Amino acid sequence: MDFYKSIALDLEILGPQATDSLKELAYHRLEDKIVRLEFRPGIFVTEKELADSIGIGRTPVREAIQHLATAGLLSVLPRRGIKVSEVDALSVLRLLEVSRSLDIAVARAAAIRATSIQRHEFSRLAEEFDSVSASNDSVAQIRLDSEFNNLCMLAMGNEHARKMCRLIQPLTRRFWFAHH
C-alpha cells in the first residue's frame, strides 16, 4: 500500500468524521513533503507555494496550514509568513520518551484486537520489511513504518491514542529524515 493509498484508506475509515476530505488530503500531502524535507526546516513559504506544490486549492490548504501549525511542523508568523519549523533534537528526544510508552500500549492492544484481515496485513508488512531492510531505501523503510503504525492504530481501535500518535509520528519521522 503506497502512502497516498494509505491516506485514502484513512479518509474512508474516518467516514463522516472527515467533513472536508480535501483539507485532510492537503494536510497529509503537505505533512509528507515537510517530513521528507522537501520544504527545508527554517524556510518561509507562501500559501500559494504550498497549494501549488500539492495541486490543491488554497482554501483546504489554508485549513491544513493551521493543523500543521498545531502539530508543530509549521509556524504562522503574523506579517512575516509561514515558516517550516526547525528540527530540534532535544524536543524530539523528549517526544521519543512519550512515544515509546504509547507505541508499546498501541502494539499490545493491536495484537489482541486485530481482525484476521489486519493480521494478514501485518504479515504482509513484515515480509515487506524483511525485503526492504537489506536495502538502504530509507523512503521505503519510513513508508512501511508509517503503514505499520497506521495499521496498529486501526487495529487498536482507540481514537484517543490515534490522535496522540498522529501528533508525534510526523515529528519523529522528520527528525529521522533530517539526521539519517
Predicted segments — roles?
Residues 116-178:
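Conserved amphipathic alpha-helical segments that form helical-bundle/coiled-coil interaction surfaces
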